[in-house]
Amino acid sequence: MSFIMSSLRNLFLSPLRSFIQKDFHDAFDSMTLLDKLLFMMVHFVDKLILWHRLPVFLGLAYLAARRHLHQEYNLINVGRTPTGVRSNPEDYPYRTADGKYNDPFNEGAGSQFSFFGRNVMPVDQHDKLKKPDPMVVATKLLARKNFMDTGKQFNMIAASWIQFMIHDWIDHLEDTHQIELRAPEEVASECPLKSFKFYKSKKTPTGFYEIKTGYLNRRTSWWDGSAIYGSNTEALKKVRTFEDGKLKLSADGLLEQDENGNIISGDVRNPWAGLLALQALFIQEHNLVCDTLKKEYPKLEDEDLYRHARLVTSAVIAKVHTIDWTVELLKTDTLLAGMRANWYGLLGKKFKDTFGHVGGSSLGGFVGMKKPENHGVPYSLTEEFVSVYRMHQLLPDTLQLRNIDATPGPNKSLPLTNEIPMEDLIGGKGEENLSRIGYTKQMVSMGHQACGALELMNYPIWMRDLIPQDVDGNDRPDHIDLAALEIYRDRERSVARYNEFRRRMLQIPISKWEDLTDDEEAIKMLREVYGDDVEELDLLVGMSAEKKIKGFAISETAFFIFLIMASRRLEADKFFTSNYNEETYTKKGLEWVNTTESLKDVLDRHYPEMTGKWMNSNSAFSVWDSSPEPHNPIPIYFRVPQQ
């Protein structure tokens, strides 16, 4: 009987297989019948380059189908999974210092020094680490020629925010062995550094037969606010006051310093003034939550206040990222609806506020689900996730300081007073200059300045001669060329190059440079570096060159990693699902999260005059003197994207 069914299935699917591009035949053959049908739908839409032009409800259906396929075929575990060991969830109704015990079936999942997972299988590039030379790629294709910005869409607070998230999520453990890159003669005169030394990523045996070695994450992978709390007990002790649950913060609202002059915060490595400002803001948020909870529940002691406030503050950060930052990054009605559905479900905020979480993740959202969902793969962030978050082009060459004493002009615009080179805003210098500038002026200035665009030839030159720091925030002696290093890192960590990356993410690969971009100068330089071999194209270069979807500040290639991993950060975490309740957060704490909708709400709590006086835009992440978006009377699911 099974033979007959198999024959009938093959008879039905054979004609369909001929429609599918050959790149996907092996993947298609490995799929279940339902997944094959979903893939056919996705592939058909991809061939027509259509999904982002569909009415919103159809675009959401496409993204739901694609996300399902990625959840089935693009979540790959690295390392062993423990068997027969289970912790009691009731023993850990709080976020631990190192991220352990979130998953009762795998205590180490997402914790400090757990493995980075994979979205696609590793592609060994040991024999191609310098082909083409990373410094040639950086010089000819990445280095900034003329600054390109994002217009009014995305500002410097938005650029700072993503570094704030990176300091929460990811940092590879390094080896003790240094290696050196030297600039080839053809580009040496254009390279700020003729050579530079750096530490290799530390390879660690996994104890597993399929992927034998992997890389460890020095930060916790959970959305747990570790940028302000740290990723272990030692770091947490440094930031806590041990009074009323609070964290250390100076009287001027900026970060405190230790006896060595280093900042006191959860993660102190490689900061700049924008990151420091956000760390300080959310320490203020944590401390205000503590005050509020203490007033509401006088019997709560220091440890309980800290634990509840951390849960609340981490959830506020996750919510702001989900329904505010990402919505501005992917500025389309489809993604506005999609990101809000991640948090509130398709039934929407009003329904959820009234009736609670109803239905599964689609109708009710990931937040508040009855139990976490990891799709059978232990939670981690992935090597590919790290790669698509390489966004240093967002940073400009200078920060434009505004005169906050002047009377705001049209759209609350402010005159420019002076510009500070970005080199003076990183590390210890950045901390000193932030103190001189003052918090309000720093935030308002960042709010009024557009950030850089994620394009070819827009990587900051000043980042090609950069002083990196160690994990304690101390400057290292060897400067680095970060643009070249990022190319090397992807190859070193066996991340697939652009075309293979797309294939394995079920995206149609390019066959010629013209498929990637219409820019003739870019095509000329791509040929100069890679010849006509599109398979050699590095991932970062391809994502920078790729034609952008209207409204997207990132490439579609990067977005599909976002699609799966943004959902995963919420749905796999018990504190956003089964434990997202009054018992865990307290009634007042849960109310705090549920009534926070944006970064503007957070700013208004701590700097009540700031947004009212100087912000004209809808979001604190778009340029502040931009016009508010007009009301659209058409229900969002029935809107059609403007071409």
Curated annotation (Swiss-Prot):
PROSITE patterns according to UniProt: PEROXIDASE_3
Cofactor, how bound (note): Binds 1 heme b (iron(II)-protoporphyrin IX) group per subunit.
Induction: Induced by infection with the bacterial pathogen Xanthomonas campestris pv glycine 8ra.
Site (Transition state stabilizer): R269
Positions in coiled-coil regions: none
Sequence intervals crossing the membrane: none
A GO molecular-function annotation: oxidoreductase activity, acting on single donors with incorporation of molecular oxygen, incorporation of two atoms of oxygen
Chain sites annotated for binding heme b: H172, H392, R489, R493
Keyword Lipid biosynthesis: yes
List of residues binding Ca(2+): D168, T220, W222, D224, S226
Cofactor requirement: heme b; Ca(2+)
Key word Lipid biosynthesis present: yes
Catalytic residue positions: H167 (proton acceptor)
GO BP annotations listed: defense response; fatty acid biosynthetic process; oxylipin biosynthetic process; response to oxidative stress
Annotated keywords: Calcium, Dioxygenase, Fatty acid biosynthesis, Fatty acid metabolism, Heme, Iron, Lipid biosynthesis, Lipid metabolism, Metal-binding, Oxidoreductase, Oxylipin biosynthesis, Peroxidase, Plant defense
Family: Belongs to the peroxidase family.
Function: Alpha-dioxygenase that catalyzes the primary oxygenation step of a variety of 14-20 carbon fatty acids, containing up to three unsaturated bonds, into their corresponding 2R-hydroperoxides. Involved in the production of oxylipins that function in cell signaling, wound healing, and protection from infection. The lipid-derived signaling pathway is involved in the initial response of hot pepper plants to pathogen infection.
PANTHER family found in the cross-reference section: ALPHA-DIOXYGENASE 1, PROSTAGLANDIN G/H SYNTHASE
Protein name: Alpha-dioxygenase 1
Organism expressing this protein natively: Capsicum annuum
